[in-house]
Regions:
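N-terminal assembly/interaction segments in proteins that build large macromolecular machines
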Residues: 1-131
């Protein structure tokens, strides 16, 4: 239904419709930013060779989302990204091009997860270890 609305608002232009959908997704994520995240999970990732490791806390509003395989996959993907890119802090991480798709930032990737669940999702903290 939302795709139909996007195409109608873009007068059939697929490129403009995609831009409209992205804008709607950002607005959706912003509208959820004031909600409380009281659930979530801890993800631990150890890179092959055992010399780099990451632990992170990815939070959600409900356990329904935090137990979902897509949410768990997102936590794992962000942990792998942190292992590969060594960001200094959360703000720097969210601005980095996402390692699996450089056309989007890590923040944009997390916003796409927000859109799929309709809940606020927040990267609360992370730590990267390297020997």
């Amino acid at each position: 239904m939302i795709c139909k609305k996007a195409l109608e608002s873009a007068e059939g232009d697929e490129t403009k419709a995609l831009e409209w959908l992205k804008k709607q997704g950002v607005e959706m994520a912003e509208s959820k930013s004031q909600r409380t995240t009281k659930d979530g999970l801890i993800e631990a990732y150890i890179h092959s060779g055992g010399r780099v490791g990451v632990i992170l806390e990815l939070k959600s509003e409900t356990d329904f989302v935090s137990k979902n395989p897509l949410f768990k996959e997102a936590a794992h993907n962000v942990a792998m990204h942190i292992a590969a890119s060594s960001p200094e802090n959360i703000d720097a991480l969210l601005q980095q091009p996402y390692i699996k798709d450089a056309s989007v930032t890590v923040g944009g990737y997390l916003n796409s997860i927000v859109q799929k669940f309709g809940e606020k999702i927040e990267l609360a903290r992370f730590e990267r270890f390297e020997i």
